[in-house]
């Protein structure tokens, strides 16, 4: 596996692999089994797979955890290599942001859910991804469904800016207790890890209600809130596949999304129905 630290090295690597199908897995590091599954999917689908590790400052708001975000470059390199990546791109901020030009995320999608409490977050996401897409020019890019809103916004970005890239959604990877894998899980203490499983249990409750014939969004959200108690709930929303809020669940067309605080750590999870 090649370790690439600047754009010139990426261009040289791509020149050596000209004409091959390129898969791309963008990450902020602190790689775990969820990221590993994305990398393995890329390796399966493409002739060459590139992983990026970059803690993108423009998607963090003032007071968020940019400085404390978990970083372990040596382990990230090990995980990417073990998963079969052909190259890992580890740029610094000066490489990615030589100027302050940015991209605005679509306001209708970026101002709800995560965007309601993190204004500007998705502008940072879209800006850095547009840069990576231009540098690497992949055929396919891989995103986990855990960040569903990000996934849908990226699909919109690619369509709107005419990037010739297939966005490949990948299923959420969970621990044995159902907790969705996340780099921010490293912030949780032992008792908080147990409490964090309530997010998944609330989604399981929702799925059981739908299976039993309950489709009312209000009823389902109320029952989910009981499961989440006493966690501080940021939101429970039930939407269609374009993130429009809906009153009734339609099977194979709906998504249930949760954001809640476990101690000081904000976690998200979702279920596609």
Regions found by a protein language model. Name each.
Residues 2-230, 239, 271:
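Nucleotidyltransferase catalytic core that binds NTPs
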Residues 223-273:
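Phosphate/ribose-recognition catalytic cores of enzymes acting on nucleotide-derived substrates
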């Amino acid at each position: 596996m090649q370790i690439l630290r600047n754009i010139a090295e990426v261009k040289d690597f791509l020149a050596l692999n000209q004409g091959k199908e390129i898969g791309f897995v963008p990450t902020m590091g602190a790689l775990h089994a969820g990221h590993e599954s994305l990398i393995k999917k890329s390796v399966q689908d493409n002739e060459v797979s590139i992983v990026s590790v970059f803690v993108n400052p423009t998607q963090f708001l003032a007071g968020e955890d940019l400085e404390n975000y978990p970083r372990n470059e040596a382990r990230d390199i090990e995980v990417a290599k073990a998963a079969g990546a052909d190259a890992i791109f580890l740029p610094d901020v000066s490489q990615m942001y030589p100027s302050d030009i940015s991209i605005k995320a679509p306001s209708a999608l970026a101002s709800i859910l995560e965007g309601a409490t993190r204004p500007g977050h998705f502008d940072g996401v879209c800006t850095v991804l547009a840069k990576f897409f231009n540098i690497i020019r992949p055929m396919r890019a891989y995103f986990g469904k855990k960040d569903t809103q990000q996934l849908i916004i990226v699909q919109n970005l690619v369509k709107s800016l005419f990037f010739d890239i297939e966005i490949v959604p990948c299923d959420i990877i969970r621990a044995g207790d159902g907790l969705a894998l996340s780099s921010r899980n490293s912030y949780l203490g032992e008792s908080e890890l147990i409490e964090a499983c309530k997010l998944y249990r609330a989604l399981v409750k929702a799925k059981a209600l739908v299976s039993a014939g309950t489709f009312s969004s209000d009823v389902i959200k109320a029952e989910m809130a009981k499961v989440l108690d006493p966690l501080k709930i940021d939101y429970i929303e039930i939407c269609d596949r374009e993130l429009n809020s809906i009153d009734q669940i339609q099977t194979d067309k709906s998504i249930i999304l949760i954001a809640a605080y476990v101690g000081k750590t904000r976690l998200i999870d979702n279920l596609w129905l």
